[in-house]
Amino acid sequence: MLEFFRPPRARSPRELVQLLPEAWTTSRSSTGSANPSASRKPARYPRIHAPELQSGEARWPLWSRIRPLEDPLKQRLTNLEKKITNVTTKFEQIEKCCKRNDEVLFRLENHAETLRAAMISLAKKIDVQTGRRPYE
């Protein structure tokens, strides 16, 4: 049962060209007859051992636009700069949040102190009205 799910084996380019229909691999003359001396490989495929490819030129013109033009060191530096800016912005955001929290905590502590003072003064007033003196 596992053989059913096994992917097909990879084929070489020559095997793939041999699998193409005969009409695709033979070129036709202007009269429409097949030319048996033509190569079985279509002409639109680049030759792998062409001298212009060995000189280091790009095989496809699109590759030069996709390929990164910067060297790896510059790419590393730009990536590091991006990471540093991200870290500094996150640090600034955290610092702002901490400042806000400090302000809120300071206000809450002040409110707690005023509430304690108000409770003590109310307790003293109640004691004076009832005639108790527990603070002595």
Swiss-Prot record:
Region: Disordered, residue numbers: 22-50
Organism superkingdom: Viruses
GO (cellular component) term, any one: membrane
Matching InterPro entries: Chordopox_Fusion/A27
Compartments (UniProt record): Virion membrane
Major subcellular site: virion
Keywords per UniProt: Glycoprotein, Host-virus interaction, Membrane, Viral attachment to host cell, Virion, Virus entry into host cell
Function as written in the Swiss-Prot or TrEMBL entry: This protein appears to play an important role in virus penetration at the level of cell fusion. The N-terminal proximal region is essential for fusion ability. Essential in fusing the outermost of the two Golgi-derived membranes enveloping the virus with the plasma membrane, and in its subsequent release extracellularly.
Description of how the protein assembles with itself and partners: Homotrimer, covalently linked.
Protein name per UniProt: 14 kDa fusion protein
Highest classification ranks of the organism: Viruses, Varidnaviria, Bamfordvirae, Nucleocytoviricota, Pokkesviricetes
